[in-house]
From Swiss-Prot:
UniProt-listed InterPro entries: ArsR-like_HTH, LexA, LexA-like, LexA/Signal_pep-like_sf, LexA_DNA-bd_dom, LexA_repressor, Peptidase_S24_LexA, Peptidase_S24_S26A/B/C
Broadest EC class assigned to this enzyme: hydrolase
Stated name of the protein: LexA repressor
Active site: S122 (for autocatalytic cleavage activity), K159 (for autocatalytic cleavage activity)
DNA-binding region: 28-48
Family as reported in the entry's similarity comment: Belongs to the peptidase S24 family.
Signal peptide: none
Reaction catalyzed: Hydrolysis of Ala-|-Gly bond in repressor LexA
Length: 203
């Protein structure tokens, strides 16, 4: 990251690591706590530097409004875009790679990470918007509360995962939508493809 100052590099690396671990970006307060900034103004100063250099976008009025726009020069690897996820009413899954995103998969903690494009607003309360690209880390064993990409009857959807004994719920993050509920008999038609590892928003 030759074009970034030392502090900007530290801020950017923390944003990437935090997003990879949690599936959403850190708040300014979390940046301050992690990097020892005494004032939010210091964090905002370095975030503005990253924004001016095209690394991030910061949405006003949002607690977690940081969006990564690019990775450092020289970062290797690209994330395959394998189709679209329906956030709301699922659409037919596209199995072949449609495109790639110029983002290093290593930032998301998985060499097998792939991306999908969101359609709809059923995850809007999780700050996932129509047109966003969600990075998925493959796993078949999600934890309750994880946001997962699930294949249901050959269609892909993005939802919160919750399992209670022999019952699985795929829950939206929008009060206008109802959860999908499945019993053990339905499991043959429900397959978790992976958990959300990050989000990319193009502007």
């Amino acid at each position: 990251m030759e074009d970034l100052t030392e502090k900007q590099s530290l801020v950017f690396e923390f944003i990437m690591e935090y997003t990879a671990d949690h599936g959403y970006p850190p708040t300014v307060r979390e940046l301050c706590d992690e990097l020892g900034f005494k004032s939010p103004n210091t964090a905002h100063f370095h975030l503005k530097g990253l924004k001016d250099k095209g690394y991030i976008q910061s949405a006003k009025g949002k607690n977690r409004g940081i969006t990564v726009l690019k990775t450092p020069p020289g970062a290797g690897g690209k994330i395959p875009l394998v189709g679209r996820i329906a956030a709301g009413a699922p659409i037919l899954a596209v199995e072949n790679v449609m495109d790639t995103l110029d983002v290093d998969r290593a930032f998301f903690g998985s060499s097998d990470a792939f991306s999908v494009r969101v359609e709809g607003d059923s995850m809007i309360e999780a700050h996932i918007e129509d047109g966003d690209y969600v990075v998925i880390k493959p796993t078949a064993t999600p934890r309750n509360g994880d946001i997962v990409a699930a294949l249901v009857n050959d269609e892909v959807t993005l939802k919160y995962f919750h399992r209670d004994g022999s019952r699985i719920e795929l829950r939206p993050a929008n009060v206008r939508y109802k959860p999908f509920c499945y019993t053990e008999e339905d499991f043959i038609d429900v397959r978790v493809l992976g958990v959300m590892a990050g989000l990319i928003r193009k502007v």
